[in-house]
């Protein structure tokens, strides 16, 4: 009996060592389509992690909303069933709206450099602290994305052309309010549902960066890319704190450093792809149509007044002046 107890004890001691040898699977979800800049960079992340962890960590990527829209994925990352989320606008606009809605205000952000100055600097720290406290989502990095453009089946030059047009926008208050004030009939909808809605005529148009217009094949259902360039933003990478806190220190370092590298690679791919995407969309039958930007900017000039009571005091002005 004594020998049996000793064997059992030895087995119990060996168990953690055996468990440690099993590769940890990391699931990363995102709505950006397969083959785009974000997806290519996610593939690099998987390779970097496998190499640096010597196979102890493996990454499975789920592009194109395979794990649901961004609303669903926020919950999954919070619970730890998805370990890493690679998000567009939904996350900060809904979870930390006091800051996120400001960044989603049309024509507030002047350029990609302006955006990065805000989100990579001290102004954004309270936003990331709130993200962690409210939902257990740890901010890691931002990757670039192209400007958002409106796609439709008839050319749009000024807001007057939008009257009565049914537009899909993300599930974000500032987006909904902006397009309503421009005269459109707004339908918030998760991205994976948009292609079918366009094909069936449930909606007349949508707005997204060129990458998502291409990878979601919207050129099969839309004729015009109207060059509104109304939002300049990025993709945010967050990890589940519930999962991350349980990683050994060396694996935490590998994951964090590889995610930052992933975003720098994505920035490069995105810059390279932007002009290529324009050519591909034109080849797919789309016309790139200039708009009268000043008519959109002036029509939306009062939008911040609708929301400023909800926003973090002084944040809008600080972004404007940065």
Where are the predicted features?
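Low-complexity basic/metal-binding stretches
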Residues: 2-5
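N-terminal secretory/targeting leader peptides
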Residues: 7-11, 16-114, 123-322
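Short beta-strand-centered segments that line the small-molecule binding cleft or hinge
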Residues: 117
């Amino acid at each position: 009996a004594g020998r049996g107890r000793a064997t059992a004890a030895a087995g119990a001691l060996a168990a953690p060592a055996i468990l440690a040898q099993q590769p940890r699977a990391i699931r990363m979800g995102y709505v950006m389509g397969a083959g785009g800049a974000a997806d290519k960079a996610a593939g690099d992340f998987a390779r970097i992690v496998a190499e640096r962890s010597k196979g102890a960590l493996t990454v499975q990527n789920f592009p194109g909303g395979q794990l649901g829209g961004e609303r669903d994925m926020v919950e999954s990352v919070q619970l730890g069933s998805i370990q890493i989320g690679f998000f567009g606008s939904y996350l900060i606009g809904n979870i930390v709206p006091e800051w996120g809605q400001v960044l989603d205000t049309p024509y507030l952000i002047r350029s990609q450099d302006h955006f990065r100055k805000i989100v990579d600097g001290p102004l954004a720290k309270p936003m990331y602290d709130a993200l962690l406290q409210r939902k257990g989502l740890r901010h890691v990095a931002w990757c670039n994305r192209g400007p958002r453009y409106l796609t439709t089946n008839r050319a749009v030059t000024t807001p007057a052309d939008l009257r009565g047009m049914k537009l899909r926008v993300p599930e974000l208050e500032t987006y909904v309010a902006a397009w309503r004030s421009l005269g459109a009939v707004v339908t918030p909808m998760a991205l994976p549902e948009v292609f079918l809605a366009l094909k069936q005529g449930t909606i007349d148009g949508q707005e997204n960066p060129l990458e998502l217009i291409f990878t979601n094949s919207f050129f099969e259902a839309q004729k015009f890319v109207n060059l509104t360039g109304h939002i300049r933003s990025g993709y945010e990478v967050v990890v589940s704190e519930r999962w991350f806190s349980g990683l050994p220190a060396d694996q935490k370092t590998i994951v964090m450093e590889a995610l930052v590298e992933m975003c720098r690679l994505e920035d490069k791919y995105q810059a390279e792809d932007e002009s290529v995407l324009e050519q591909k969309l034109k080849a797919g039958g789309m016309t790139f149509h200039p708009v009268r930007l000043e008519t959109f900017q002036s029509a939306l000039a009062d939008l911040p007044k609708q929301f400023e009571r909800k926003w973090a005091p002084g944040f809008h002005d600080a972004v404007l002046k940065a």
